[in-house]
């Protein structure tokens, strides 16, 4: 249990690899302690779900268009058959303005494909201020490894 009390090994692994795949107990609690330790050491943290990301790199870092849900009968002549496209600012845009490093914690990472995981791993290498932790499932005790090792293992 001393591993969870300090979080030092987790933080040093996160700083050296940039992107970690984590297996945590399903009852929760361990990841919250790690997040609290990261915040105390000067990181900004954001927790979000991996479901519905689409292209993760574009969703997180670039201006992109979305189509709002269809709400019944609408005038087709106004916006075409597909509906209007709304431009959305990237999720990490405002968080990277400050000098503090950012940890993005992605829940339900097991839904991401191998190519999406590789793209996220490349994002960590291109932008050194972004550190990403992806929950890839459950385990009896908390375990983590670099994301590229996790991808190559399968």
From Swiss-Prot:
Its EC number is 7.1.1.-. Its main location: membrane. It is found in: Cellular thylakoid membrane. InterPro entries: NAD(P)H-quinone_OxRdtase_su_N (IPR020874). GO terms for cellular component: plasma membrane-derived thylakoid membrane. Belongs to the complex I NdhN subunit family. This is NAD(P)H-quinone oxidoreductase subunit N.
């Amino acid at each position: 249990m001393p591993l969870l009390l300090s979080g030092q090994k987790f933080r040093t692994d996160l700083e050296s690899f940039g992107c970690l795949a984590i297996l945590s107990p399903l009852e929760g609690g361990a990841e919250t302690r790690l997040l609290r330790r990261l915040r105390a050491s000067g990181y900004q943290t954001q927790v979000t779900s991996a479901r519905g990301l689409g292209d993760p790199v574009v969703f997180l870092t670039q201006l992109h268009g979305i189509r709002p849900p269809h709400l019944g009968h609408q005038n087709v002549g106004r916006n075409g058959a597909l509906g209007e496209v709304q431009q959305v600012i990237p999720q990490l845009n405002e968080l990277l303005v400050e000098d503090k490093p950012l940890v993005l914690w992605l829940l339900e990472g097991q839904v991401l494909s191998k190519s999406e995981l590789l793209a996220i791993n490349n994002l960590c290498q291109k932008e050194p201020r972004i550190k990403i932790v992806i929950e890839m499932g459950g385990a009896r005790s908390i375990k983590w490894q670099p994301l590229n090792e996790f991808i190559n293992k399968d």
